[in-house]
């Protein structure tokens, strides 16, 4: 399931990047503005996130499709070491398969220089700034997921919030770091485009940012972990992860434990 979700995510990234940036794309003459293309890319990938979360696979597996997310839930006690390892391996292999399928379906178009397999690469400010940016946006994304998914009211909107952040990040942050927040998202294109020089950024910064978010989450909640490891609890699929306490009606109540 996680392999399929990561594959869909990377297939969508390659297909949208080809549509928006390939010189032979029929929409190229109508989209000369780079900022507009990034906004459309963000909207497309945000909708992709929503679609993945709401599939039967996403409802069952939790819709991580990101080794950094899986590592964070392992840290929070929701997953066993073996489950986390298999999840991560599936996500990485799925990302590779997604890029391969996009290349096959689109007859090699994602390899074009302007598209470069929808790779996530450091922007104009260099590797150091890209690392910091990836850590920050990953911290914000995981903080939003953890706090909303464990709130009785807001948990219904966690997947919408996560998708919205992805869309905003791609539209406005991608010139800085390429916008990954996901080692698998970067790994798939890197395999085919041989983009190795900055791979370490995307394998280190997102996990560090998300793990930092988990520490803040635990601190605010007085050490109480999350209910489940899903982005969408309100469905007919049982939680396959280690259960936590019931959803909090108010985050403020749990924060009283550290007062």
Regions found by a protein language model. Give the residues of each.
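Membrane-interface helix-loop junctions and terminal tails of multi-pass membrane proteins
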Residues: 1-259
